[in-house]
Amino acid sequence: MKITAVQAYPLSIPRPQPSWTAHEISTEATLILVEVQTDAGLRGYGEIQSGPLPLVCRLVEQFGEIIRGMDALAHLEVWEKLFALTSPRPGWMRGQDDLPPPLPRGQRPQIMAALGGIDIALWDIKGKAANMPLYQLLGGVRQEIFTYATGGY
């Protein structure tokens, strides 16, 4: 099952009331929806909560061009190929690999967010292809788990 397209959709809605963190005031809720399409007709979806939205969307679509034609079920191979772009590679410096030049180090948080959104979408495809919820695909057996949430740190 081959990857045929990767799209990034920036989403933003105004908050009814501002939200505060230690660093900023937020007047809107934003995220990026990542869609990976396959030649088998399956679509996987991932989510990114990082910005700036235009930069992260551009990175997702740039990565999509690099992984087009790869096996959508081989998420580790995709991850390794994209992760290789995050630092200088001896093979690239000698002209011996077919990947683009390394990405700017100052954009590492956005690069890793883009990579993560694609990875989540590939896991979604893997679960759909196996006709299993992801927790079962990963070996989960519990019907209930304890949760904890925090925010605004």
Positions of the model-derived regions?
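Short, solvent-exposed polar/charged micro-motifs at secondary-structure junctions
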Residues: P14-Q17, T86-S87, F146-T147
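Active-site/binding-pocket entry motifs
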Residues: Y9-S12, P88, Y153
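Flexible hinge/switch segments at interdomain interfaces of large molecular machines
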Residues: L137-R142
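Active-site mouth loops of central-metabolism enzymes
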Residues: E144-Y153
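Metal- or metallocofactor-binding catalytic centers and their adjacent structured scaffolds
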Residues: Q37-A129
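Broad gene-expression machinery/nucleic-acid interaction feature
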Residues: L31-L33, G117, E144
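Structured beta-strand/loop patches that form or line metal/cofactor-binding pockets in enzymes
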Residues: M1-Q49
